[in-house]
């Protein structure tokens, strides 16, 4: 199973423009679970709390600049045995996203992101995505590595430059605290695509759809 059975999210936002962008279940600017290339306005901070059928996740995300989004999260899986019981394990991780918007109106915003890059490996993944903003419609496409790769994947395009990108070292379930640069953007990749549609005459209502290859039970 690759999607939440149910998600209850509470979002507290401190920002200049509350309607600028929306957030995914991991507390990132994005779609449902996928990230987009967007970031929130400068000098903003927001908190998200997600309750799924098999984990609890709380994230604090800051946008100090219009090209940088960083988040710190805690999560508690419900199905992991720890201390002789389930639901007691508590872990943390870090996410970072670098975003760039070319001056041309014809070119999309592009972002490079590292999720859980210094954690224990439960959510370790990388992505490169672009987001086109067509007023009432935002289209996000890109590639994901690591935990993004599910049952369907493609060859790593970076393998054209070096064979070492073809395989990804299994980071396992580590202690965290140190980034493993030997795995970043390594191994097979998977396409990411999703869109967000704003309903006309209802500024606060949007529809989101995405492919979500991430395997939460891997």
Regions found by a protein language model. Give the residues of each.
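Sec-dependent N-terminal signal peptides
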Residues: 4-15
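Detector for outer-membrane/organellar transmembrane beta-barrel domains
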Residues: 125-217
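Transmembrane beta-barrel domains of Gram-negative outer membranes and organellar outer membranes
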Residues: 20-122, 134-135, 146-147, 179, ...
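Structural motif marking the loop-to-transmembrane transition
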Residues: 3-4, 205
